[in-house]
Amino acid sequence: MQNELLDDPMDTGAPAAEAAAADEPLPPAHGIDREVTPKPAGNPDLMQQSLDNPAIPMHLIEKRDDRRESCDDGYSLTVNESAIDIESLACSYDSNAFFLRARFIARHCPILRADAYISLINYLKEHTTDITHYVAFFNELESELARKEFKNRQLNFQIPLRDQKWIEENGATWQSTTDQLQAEYKRHKDEGVKESTRRAMEDLFQHYMMAGKIDEAIRLYSRGIRDYCTQLKHSINMWINWMEVAICANDWGKLDTVTNTAYRSLKDADDAEKNSQQSQQAPPQRGENAPYMVERDPNAPIQTLTNRQLIETALAKCLAAQVLLKLRNKRYSQVVETILQIKTECLQSKWFVTSSDLGIYGMLSAMATMSRADLKLQVSGNGTFRKLLESEPQLIELLGSYTSSRFGRCFEIMRSVKPRLLLDPFISRNVDELFEKIRQKCVLQYLQPYSTIKMATMAEAVGMSSAELQLSLLELIEQKHVSLKIDQNEGIVRILDERDENAILKRVNVTCDRATQKAKSLLWKTTLAGANIHSISDKETRPKRKNQKESAKFDRNFGGIDVDEDPRGIAGPSGLSDDFNIAYDQQPQQQVQYLEDLGDI
């Protein structure tokens, strides 16, 4: 039987198929055997340019966008509004976060496509050595500028010139740098020094990321980077890199595994750090090592981040990555719960998601899943959400309109912010579903107090046309959220009461029987009290146990009144008539009279 390779659930490396090749030597920097002529997989113009210019390595042009290019494959979307300012986007995000968002806009917004490509070209040239995307984006920009529809359009950026010198220099140095880093990594690995091996792996990983080689970076980290992390800060850096590269590669399965394992490890480290700090913070004795105000030297070097700060930053990023994952899986209730756990002050300001993004994701998810009472309590009245939405006054107004039943204004704001949300790569696929859920909840909330309502009045109140309202009502009927009839001739909507009449009558009869029984019981008690009849339960007639004699004696004190025993040995309160304890020792004729009275009742 052939041995099967199984994945270790605690291992953050690649799947078993990739781990099996971990012992194989790294491929050479040139990547492709020159004797084999590969089939061009990228742009033919890029291939021809690489053949004409030997300074550009063939492997940099052959495979174009790696996994980042497939992040929105199969997603058909076109936004024909200029809903985002590309310049402000570059200020709000950096590195791979800006790359993903600008690339998504270039694919799905024809109006902003040229501006997005120009920003991407400038970013790649200034901050990376990614020749592949640089050349590809230039070709796409030239194709966009050559279109007839583009002639009357104005650009917000100056069109750059293709820097052939930069392409040749980076193409020539990339191969030698890769060979050098690979040789250094192999040498340290053979020597068995963990710290040196980890540094070599980190250098090679960053080199691949700078060149846009996501697959190579993942394959390198899958060779067991976790085994070489000897300090807490090394492990934290590893988790953050794993999460970022998984998001860039659009590998949501890997992101799920990494975030779950990272969260457990970081929480354990956080608990250990808290216990360590508490043990070290013992109060000093009076007069011994008492802290006084000390003037700080302005020339002294700034202290690096403590382990606690590193852990909190990593936890914030881990939870933010889980928000993206749960949003992708449409678990909207968990999105709200996770956002409330994030310490936004510890989250990097220009990461894949900002505090404002988290506020938008959480607010829309809450509106789509929570009742209005819970929404007011957990979102409107929550300081965390108010802080997240400080820079989004329009969305704050949307939330207020929804909770105050101003549905017309609510739908108006939703229509105005929809294009901007559609150009967000992390929530774009959820916008239509979230808005539909919110719209249905608004319609149901409006119908609740009515049994009959005019469609024209309702359409005006919710800010929809009669046709749109009718379609929305039909969807609610099909999903069995409401039972109603639409009279198109009179333009009236009638709400049907599906409650069973027999069940209602049965409940009424049960209630009446209970009330009658209670009234009879009161009359019986009144008659018994008028006849001076005292009812004794079985519990009171049971013989007392030996250990209860003393307690029983004290129970006969009647709240402090002295009890005297008569000659017959029967205890009775002094000064009270024996009629107080009369039971059924009266004359039989009187008993018959009492029973007849009770029978009449």
Curated annotation (Swiss-Prot):
Residues 1-10 have a biased composition (Acidic residues). Residues 1-54, 268-294, 535-581 are annotated as: Disordered. SUPFAM superfamilies: Winged helix' DNA-binding domain (SSF46785). It comes from Caenorhabditis elegans. Belongs to the CSN1 family. Its main location: cytoplasm. Gene3D superfamilies: 1.25.40.570. Essential component of the COP9 signalosome complex (CSN), a complex involved in various cellular and developmental processes. The CSN complex is an essential regulator of the ubiquitin (Ubl) conjugation pathway by mediating the deneddylation of the cullin subunits of the SCF-type E3 ligase complexes, leading to decrease the Ubl ligase activity of SCF. The CSN complex plays an essential role in embryogenesis and oogenesis and is required to regulate microtubule stability in the early embryo. The keyword Cytoplasm applies. This is COP9 signalosome complex subunit 1. GO terms for cellular component: COP9 signalosome; cytoplasm; nucleus. Keywords: Cytoplasm, Developmental protein, Differentiation, Nucleus, Oogenesis, Signalosome. InterPro entries: PCI_dom (IPR000717), Rpn7/CSN1 (IPR019585), Rpn7_N (IPR045135), WH_DNA-bd_sf (IPR036390). Residues 14-24 have a biased composition (Low complexity).
